[in-house]
Amino acid sequence: MNRTHNRNDRRRFLKLAAGLAGIGLLRPTTTFAQHEAQITRVIASSGQRLPLIGMGTSRTFDVTPDPAAMANLGEVLQAFFQQGGTVIDSSPMYGNSEQVLGDLLRRIPPPANLFAATKVWTDGEESGIEQMEHSRQLWGVDGFELIQIHNLRDWQVHYETLMAMKSEGKIRYVGITTSHGRDHDELQSVLKSHPFDFVQFSYNIGNRDAERELLPLAADRG
């Protein structure tokens, strides 16, 4: 590969990283050179620190659990834990992901401080409660640290359920998500009227619309 091209790519990446740090999107507590140290971020509602990088499971863990696929994903998960990873996020929407993840967690013991996060993605109070319990059983964990309302689906109903679960100590954090830019306006309205610990929405180099209103709103709401 052309060395000049590599240098240019690296230079662009470093400029982008510096820009993100400048607007507060990257707030590392250590330098990248400190291999053993974790780069963390504070959860505003509690003060708890989490590693800046977590493990997502959409598509990558949605596989047929044959020996080869499970072996490959097992290597990934083991390396993640060995490097200090603790945050894993999934959803019932992600096909086989929760089942595959749970099978792997039974083979590869997670760290004691595993931050298990999933979502509720259905309609109705009882269906939501049943789905969240099913997710817990698939994962094989005692409980979740975070449950988010996936893509705003029946959010008013699930919000009441999740806030009750939080007050009872069954979960630690409540969040809401959307992966669709067309729903950003509704998400803004929800965030203005209801407190959440976490919010997740589409934001990337190709789609920076969230910079105008969603990111400032999320920062203002803590």
Q: Predicted regions: what is each one?
A:
Residues 44-47, 102-111, 135-140, 166, ...:
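Acidic (Asp/Glu)-rich catalytic clusters
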Residues 43, 55, 88, 101, ...:
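Conserved, mostly hydrophobic/aromatic
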